[in-house]
Amino acid sequence: LHSELGLNNGDERSARLQARLTDHTFAVARALHRQADVTPVLAVSGLGPGNARRWGRQQGIDTVRLQGEGNLGTRIRRQLQPLRRHRIPALVVGSDLPDVHQRDLLMALENLQSHDLVLGPAADGGYWLIALSADLMQTPARWPLAGIPWGSDDVCRCTLEYAHRFNLSVALLRQQQDLDHLRDLNRWQGCRS
């Protein structure tokens, strides 16, 4: 989002927008932490370890991890691996969602009581949330992260096909508009007018 908007809109405006989106996501995560037994983890790219930890502390997030290299599936897998030993479900949510609310994440947690996988479809064909049940977290070979055409409009569809192949039960949340590109911002602003 930042680089795309920077090319078309000026770096300062895109940085302010990304900061607002990220602050909103932090606020939702903190609210969820207060209401449910959920520990937010901040996965960061573009910062060194010290700056990432400082930023997390400033936002009230104690656990901060670097995303590392690789495609989105590789980076998500890297964040999920350390959680396996806790035998808990995991939610991964993007920070480019102007309309995400605590109730969306609570709905994901509720759906994990009876489903292996929860997806929040994005209007562009991706997803804004992926959540894995505690049982699914114990079998990384079944995680729907490999062989997905990341960055395409087929991400959600291919993830659902993967889930079907592995007999994973899936719940879908409401579709949301994430802001990956300038056209997404224009579309979102048009819907808000």
Model regions and ranges:
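Conserved alpha/beta core of the MobA/IspD/sugar-nucleotide pyrophosphorylase nucleotidyltransferase superfamily
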Residues: 155-193
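Glycine-rich N-terminal loop/short-helix segment of MobA-like nucleotidyltransferase
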Residues: 1-16
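Short beta-strand/loop segment that forms part of the nucleotide-sugar
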Residues: 37-47
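Conserved donor-nucleotide/metal-binding helix-loop-beta segment in metal-dependent transferases, i.e.
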Residues: 100-125
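A short, N-terminal amphipathic alpha-helix
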Residues: 18-36
